[in-house]
């Protein structure tokens, strides 16, 4: 058991919690909590830490997880935890590098490739019709995490983000995805307008959620390849991005509401596409 914050592993772990640049260089991110750790593909867990009280209270969970863990005293675990109320388990997880093809659903998922699922059950793998959510300068970690969860539930193929959007590997984002971050492909682009034009050139119709949209969102056809553009929480889509869209759409609202939360708007659009594709 590690009982000192002066331990080399603990010093490294504390640095990883505080410095995103270090996490980027290592190609890893941190995950806390038993529910989230359960969601991690086992081959991606680089190192696992548990508190002494967690070990004492959860022997069955630890056995079932089947991953060797380093035990920390409760005090040391609290020192390296990112949360006010530590849940007693923390994992260092290897990142996956996705491509645009992954986001468009044109290749086997990275999880399939890693586990060999595609080879074992080729009939379960199929190229999917693109259903993409495009995020322009999204800044709120909670919103991004919610969009990940919703995208998975609505059947989206992936998420495209401008390079100035919040970091997917921000600990708050990771927590709020509730595990979807391990399964939903995503890709950052430096030139979002060019990326939107590229989607259109590939036959993927792009729809910008916009207050000036002339078309009502549920009157469009999303059964073919589609991408929904969602803007910054306070400012919406930048003009140079919305101008590249094939169509500006709006979500009708009652009362005095001027706009919807970015994650809510994304959910409305993605689930409408999912509904149409289930027919």
Roles of regions detected by a PLM:
Residues 109-112, 126-213:
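RNA substrate-binding interface of SAM-dependent RNA methyltransferases
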Residues 150-154, 168, 173-181, 239-279:
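Structured adenosyl-cofactor binding patch, chiefly the S-adenosyl-L-methionine
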